[in-house]
Amino acid sequence: MAQQTFTGRKRVRKFFGHIREVAEMPNLIEVQKASYDQFLMVAEPPGGRDDEGLQAVFRSVFPISDFSNASMLEFVRYEFEPPKYDVDECRQRGMTYAAPLKVTLRLIVFDIDEETGARSVKDIKEQDVYMGDIPLMTMNGTFVVNGTERVIVSQMHRSPGVFFDHDKGKTHSSGKLLFAARVIPYRGSWLDIEFDAKDIVFARIDRRRKIPVTSLMFALGLDGEEILSTFYNKILYKRTKEGWRVPFDASRFRGYSTVNDLIDADTGKVVLEAGKKLTVRAARQLQEKGLKALRLSDSELVGNYLAEDLVNPKTGEIFAEAGDELTGKPIKGDDKEIELFVGATPMKAILEQGYKELPLLDIDHVNVGPYIRNTLSADKNMTREDALFDIYRVMRPGEPPTLDSAQNMFQSLFFDAERYDLSAVGRVKMNMRLDLDAPDTHRTLRKEDILAVIKTLVGLRDGKGEIDDIDHLGNRRVRSVGELMENQYRIGLLRMERAIKERMSSVDIDTVMPQDLINAKPAAAAVREFFGSSQLSQFMDQTNPLSEITHKRRLSALGPGGLTRERAGFEVRDVHPTHYGRICPIETPEGPNIGLINSLATFARVNKYGFVETPYRKVKEGRVTDEVVYLSAMEEGRYAVAQANISLDAKGRFTDDLIVCRAGGTRDVVLIPADQVDYMDVSPKQLVSVAAALIPFLENDDANRALMGSNMQRQAVPLVRAEAPFVGTGMEGVVARDSGAAIAARRTGVIDQIDATRIVIRATEDLDPTKSGVDIYRLMKYQRSNQSTCINQRPLVKVGDKVAKGDIIADGPSTDLGELALGRNVLVAFMPWNGYNFEDSILLSERIVKEDVFTSIHIEEFEVMARDTKLGPEEITRDIPNVSEEALKNLDEAGIVYIGAEVRAGDILVGKITPKGESPMTPEEKLLRAIFGEKASDVRDTSLRVPPGVQGTIVEVRVFNRHGVDKDERALAIEREEIERLAKDRDDEQAILDRNVYGRLADLLDNRQGVAGPKGFKKDTKITRAVLEEYPKSQWWLFASPNDKLMAEIEAMRKQYDESKKGLEQRFLDKVEKLQRGDELPPGVMKMVKVFVAVKRKIQPGDKMAGRHGNKGVVSKIVPIEDMPFLEDGTHADIVLNPLGVPSRMNVGQILETHLGWACAGMGKKIGQTIDAYYQRQDLKPLRETLKKIYGDDETIKSLDDGELIELGRNLSHGVPIATPVFDGAKEADIEEMLKLAGFDASGQSTVYDGRTGDEFDRKVTVGYIYMLKLHHLVDDKIHARSIGPYSLVTQQPLGGKAQFGGQRFGEMEVWALEAYGAAYTLQEMLTVKSDDVAGRTKVYEAIVRGDDTFEAGIPESFNVLVKEMRSLGLNVDLHNSKLGVPPPAEAAE
C-alpha cells in the first residue's frame, strides 16, 4: 500500500485496511485556498472575469451616477500589482502580506439638453486608481496580518430561502401548533408569515409589529375577490324549484355528516339517510355509480361563504361582498324552515333580482380551512392605499405617510436589487421548496413568491406537506474566506459610494479625473477591520501541524450573522443524520461551544453554493462502479446509500441480497434489496475529521473519549526528536504533506547542494525555458510559532539523490520521514505502583528525562523599542548607569545580547537608557555640581530583561531602524550576513544555469564545422569539445556554424540565458535594496530590537501527557530506572499507567494499541537481529524472508536494491510501523497473529518483576508500546511565585495572576482553615503585612533586610476603603485610636 516515494521506500507501513479506496482524498486545505482564489481571481482569464468574487462586488456597486445624472463613474477592470514584501519579510517586519489593488475606472460626463432632457456624451476619461491593499493568502492557506499568521474560519449559517416551521405547541396553553413561514434573504428585510391562536394569518417585516397578511396582499395590488380566488376554489350552487343543485365530488364530500337526507338532484332518490357520515369508500362508490349532483335545502347552505360580489345589474348596488357568510334565521311559527341571509341581505331579495346561481367558496372546514377568508374579514384595511400606509407606519413609526413615500418604501423592501438580495442559493432553494421556476439570476422577491409562501403555509395548517428541519445540512451553508471577504469589501465600497456621489456633485466635473473623486480609505479600512478584529479572523493555532490543518478546516456557527453561545439550543448542537461524511460527529470542543464549532470530514468539500458535499461511489444495477459522485445533503435525500464495509465480490457486486443502507429523507438505516442501492460510501473514514482519523482503533473507543483524543492531539508539543507512531492509521503522511510542515519537491530533479538551511535541486523535468532550472528551498531554522513552539526543518536527502515531484525532501516540526509524529512510542505497563498512578497520574522512568524522549524546545520572543520622548530620545547602548560589568558580559558593543548566550531570569538582553526629568537640586547637589561640573547621570536604566521563569539560549536577534536613523554595528552585521546569504543563492543558481546552458551549447556545437569563432580560432576547422575547452565559456557564443537552424537555436538560447542572468541579478539587487532600506516602525519609535530565546523544557512532574484515545494524565513522579518494573529480558518499563483508567472510560482502543505496538517492537527487534547477522555473514536472504513474513508480497520491498533494503531494515529495527485505518483496521485475530509472529504470548501479557525488590508480581501484566504525547499545558508556564511586586491602586492589595506577576489569593475558605486551627498570628500577617497594610509591609521588608524579626501589624488599606465607601453612602464613620488600658465592660464579653 505504501507509495513509491522517496520517503516511502525508507519506511514501509504494513497496511491492515481491507477496503480499496477509490477516491483520492482532496487536499486538506482546499476549503481555504479555492475559496480565496475564486474571490481574488488574480490572473484575468481571456474574455474577462466571470461575475463572482471581487468582480461581482465592483459590478454591483458601479456604475455610480451623481444626483443629477450628469456624470457617471464606470468600473472597467481591476488588477493586482506584485506585493511589496514576501511572506517571510512580512513575518519578520510585522507587516501584512498584501498586494496593491489597481482598478481602472471610466468617468463619463454628459451634456443634458435643457428642453428635451436628452443626454449626450460630452467627455470620457479612463484612469487607474489605487484602491488599497488586499491581503494575499500564503501557500498554506493562512494570512500574515501585522506579522502574525491568522486563519479565517469558515462560518455555518442558515441558508437563504424560505423555511416553514411551527412552535411545537409551546406558545398557546392549549398546545395548538402555530405554523409560521420565514423568507430569509442573503441581505435585506426578513419576511415572517405566521398563524395566531385564532387561526388568523399575520405578516411581520423584520420582526416588527404584525399586520394581517391580507394587508400585505392588498399592498401587492390584489383586491378582496382576487385574494379569495387565489386561495379557494369556486363552486356554483344552482337554484332549482326543489332547492339548490350542487355538483357531487367524492373527494370534497368525504367525511360529510348529513343533517337531512342526501338526495340525488337528477332522480330525487335518497342516497344517504339523515344523521349518517359519508365515508371515503361510500363517497367513491356513489361517484362510480354515476351520481352527478346533489339537491340541498336552504339550511344546508348555512355557514358557506360567498365567492364573488353580488351586484344589482341595474343600479350597481352591491347586495353582498365576496367572503360574506350565509346565515339562517328561523321563521316564526315554523321549526323546520329557516330564512337564508347573505351577509345582511335576505336571499329572497337576491333571487328576485334574477340570480339563478350562487358562487360559493369551497371551504369544508376539514380539508380546507377558512383562514384567509377570516383574516380578510378581520382586516380593517380595505384598499391598497390603506395597506401601504399601515405597512409604512409599522416600518417607520412616527413619520406621516404619503402615498408616494409609502409606495417607494414598500417597493424598496423586497423588490429593489440594491436593498434586497436572495442570492443564487436563496433563489434555487426557494424554487425547490415552492415548485417555482424563476431563473437564479432573479434575486429579488416576486408577487408569485409571496403568494406561494402563503399558500404553502395555509396548506401546512390544512395538514398538507411537512415542515422543514432547520438543522438539516441542506438548510445550512458554509461561508468561506472568499465570501466573507466579498461581503466585507462590499460594505467598504458602499461607504465609499456615498462619498463619491457627494464629491461628483460638488466639484467641477469637467476638470476632474476619476482619481480625484475616489478616497479608498473606507474600502481599505473595512478589509483591515475584518482581518484584524472580526470574530472569524483568528490567531492561528500553530502548536503542531495537525492543529494548523484542523484550524483551517474548522466550521463555526458563531460570528457576525451567526448564532450566539447563549441562544443556541440543543438541536443546533446535536449530530444530525446529514452530517454523515460532511461534518465530523466526534471533533468539537468540550464546554460552552460544543456542537457550535465543528470540523469538516476528511473527504468533504464545499460546493459553489456553499453546501457541504461528500463523495459516493455510483452503484449501477447492483454493481459498484469506480465512478465517484459528490452529493450535497439535499441531493442525497433521494437516494439509498450503502456503507463502505459492505462485502463485494471480485466484480464489485454485492454478495448479500439485502443491504444495510441509509435511505429516505430521514436517513434511517434500513435493509433493502441489492438492486435498489444507488450509491456506496467511498471510504470508512469519510465520516470523521482529520484529527479523529488519526486515532487507531477509533471504533473501539467511547465517543466522549474519542472527542478528547482528537482535541488533545492538537495540543501536542513538537518534541526535539520526532518519532512516527508504530501504530498509525495511514493518514499521517497526508497530514504532514498538506499542512506544509514537511517540504515537498516542486519538480522532479537531482539534489545539487545541501546544508542545514537550504536544499538546491537541479530540475530534470518540467523545464520551462522562461523559468530557472533550479529550485532553492530555504529551511526554517528555530523559528517561533504563534504558540511559542519551535518550527525547525531538517533535510532528508543527500547530494545526488533523485527525487520526484511531490516527494518529501525535508521534515518539519512533529514530522518524521514525511509522516506526522506528534509524540513518542514508549513502553507502558498497566499496573498500580504505590499510589503514584492514582486518579490518572502517570509514573515516568528517569530514562525518559535522561534521553530527552519528551524534551521540547520553546522559543520566547522579547522586544524593546527606543522611542523619542519629550525629554529626549531613548538610546540602546551598553553604557548603562549603576550596572556591574558582570551583568553586561553577554552584550556586544551596541548593547544587544550575543547569539548563543545562555541567559536566565533577570539578565539584560538589550541595554536601554531613558532620559530622566529634571528634578530640583538640593544645596549639596549644587555644591557638587559646582565642583565637578556635569551632573552624574540624568538617565535611568530601562533595559529589556529576561522575565521570571525563563531560562535559555539566544537563537536570533533582529534589529529594526527607522528611515534615516544610523544603523549600529550589530544591525550592519546582521545585514551583511543576510546579503551574503542572498549572494550565495544567486551564485549557486547562476552556476547551475551556466552548467546547464553551456552543457547544452557544447552538445550543439560538438562535431560541427566552424565558420567563425573567438580570436585564434582557425576558420573551417571542426569544433570539438577539446577545442571548446581551450576558450573561456563566455566566448563559446562566438563560434558559428553554416547550419542556419542551429545558429537560430543558439541565438534563442543566448537570449534566454542573458534574460535569466539579468533577472537573477535584478532579484538580488531588489532584495538587497529592501534590506538596506529603513523599516516602517510605529510612530515615535526610532529603533526596535527583537530577541528570541530558546527554552529547553524537559518533562517533569506536573506536565500533562495523553495518549490518542482521550487517556490523559499528569506526571506525578519520575522514578530511577532501576526501580521501575522490568520484564524477563531486563527491559524496564518507561511508563506505568493505572489499569482502572480503562474500564469506566471505555476507551479500549488504547489496550489494542498497546498489544499491537508490542508486536511491532518485537518484529523490529527480530529485523535488528537479522541485520546484525548480515554484517557478520554478508547474506541478505534472511532479511528478505523476514520482511516477506511480515509484509507479505509488498511491491515496494521487492523493488528495493541491497543498499536500500539495509537502510529500510535499519529504520524498522526499532519497530515495524503499521497502519490500521479507522473502522477498517486490524481485528483481534490480526493482533494475535502479529504477536505470535513477534514471538510473544497471544494474550499480550508478560511476567513483570518489581524493580525495587526483584520479586515477580503475582499475575501477568499488560505491557506494550503506546504512542504518548506531551501536551501544551506545561507546569513551567503555570507555576509562579512572588515576594514583592505590583499592588492594586485602590485596595493596595497585590495583583493576581502570573501575567501581572501577582500574589496568591488567600481567600475566604483559607481564612476559615487558619481560624479552625486557631493560628491567630499567622492569620493576622496574611491579612495585613503580607497584603495591604502599606506602612506595615514596608517595615517588615526593612526588618527582614536588617535580619531583625520584630514587626507589628497596622490597619489594612481595605479598611480605609470600606470607611470611604460607607461615607459615600452618607454614614459618617470615624476611627478612634484609644490607647486607654481600660478593660471593656463585662457584658460586652458575653
Curated annotation (Swiss-Prot):
Database matches in Pfam families: RNA_pol_Rpb2_1, RNA_pol_Rpb2_2, RNA_pol_Rpb2_3, RNA_pol_Rpb2_45, RNA_pol_Rpb2_6, RNA_pol_Rpb2_7
GO molecular function: DNA binding; DNA-directed RNA polymerase activity; ribonucleoside binding
Catalytic activity as recorded in UniProt: RNA(n) + a ribonucleoside 5'-triphosphate = RNA(n+1) + diphosphate
InterPro entries (UniProt xref): DNA-dir_RNA_pol_bsu_ext_1_sf (IPR042107), DNA-dir_RNA_pol_bsu_external_1 (IPR019462), DNA-dir_RNA_pol_su2 (IPR015712), DNA-dir_RNAP_su2_dom (IPR007120), DNA-dir_RNAP_su2_hyb_sf (IPR037033), RNA_pol_bsu_bac (IPR010243), RNA_pol_bsu_CS (IPR007121), RNA_pol_bsu_protrusion (IPR007644)
Enzyme nomenclature, EC number: 2.7.7.6
Enzyme class, spelled out: transferase
Domain of life: Bacteria
CDD domains: RNA_pol_B_RPB2
Gene Ontology biological-process annotations: DNA-templated transcription
GO CC terms in record: DNA-directed RNA polymerase complex
Keywords carried by this UniProt record: DNA-directed RNA polymerase, Nucleotidyltransferase, Transcription, Transferase
PANTHER family: DNA-DIRECTED RNA POLYMERASE I SUBUNIT 2
HAMAP family assigned to the protein according to its UniProt record, in alphabetical order: RNApol_bact_RpoB
Self-association and partners: The RNAP catalytic core consists of 2 alpha, 1 beta, 1 beta' and 1 omega subunit. When a sigma factor is associated with the core the holoenzyme is formed, which can initiate transcription.
Cited function: DNA-dependent RNA polymerase catalyzes the transcription of DNA into RNA using the four ribonucleoside triphosphates as substrates.
Similarity field: Belongs to the RNA polymerase beta chain family.
Protein name according to UniProt: DNA-directed RNA polymerase subunit beta
Gene: rpoB
